[in-house]
């Protein structure tokens, strides 16, 4: 094994840099191209700031298609509003006639 000059920084050692530049390709060969390609492409790790994709905004003129729903009147209670009272009367009258 060759001795490396101790005055050189580790990233400047011979063989530390690949001979070809990094590409945007995600094939197996390019994912193992160098340490950076392996971590970002192969493992999907990036420590940089993540950009949020914004949805394309609709122009103001497209508000026409959004019709407002008219206010509905408050619905009445379901069923017969005097239902329980009448049913009690019916039960009482049936009970009186069956002695």
Curated annotation (Swiss-Prot):
One of its GO terms (cellular component) is host cell cytoplasm. It is found in: Host nucleus, Host nucleolus; Host cytoplasm; Secreted. Asymmetrical arginine methylation by host PRMT6 seems to diminish the transactivation capacity of Tat and affects the interaction with host CCNT1. InterPro entries: IV_Tat, Tat_dom_sf. The cell attachment site mediates the interaction with ITGAV/ITGB3 and ITGA5/ITGB1 integrins, leading to vascular cell migration and invasion. This interaction also provides endothelial cells with the adhesion signal they require to grow in response to mitogens. Belongs to the lentiviruses Tat family. This is Protein Tat. The lineage of its organism: Viruses, Riboviria, Pararnavirae, Artverviricota, Revtraviricetes. The gene is tat.
């Amino acid at each position: 094994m060759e001795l490396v000059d101790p005055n050189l920084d580790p990233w400047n050692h011979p063989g530390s840099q690949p001979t070809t530049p990094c590409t945007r390709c995600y094939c197996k060969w390019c994912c193992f191209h160098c340490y950076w390609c392996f971590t970002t492409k192969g493992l999907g790790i990036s420590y940089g700031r993540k950009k949020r994709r914004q949805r394309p905004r609709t122009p103001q003129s497209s508000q026409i298609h959004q019709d407002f729903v008219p206010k509905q009147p408050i619905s009445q209670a379901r069923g017969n509003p005097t239902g329980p009272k009448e049913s009690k009367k019916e039960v009482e009258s049936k009970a009186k006639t069956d002695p």
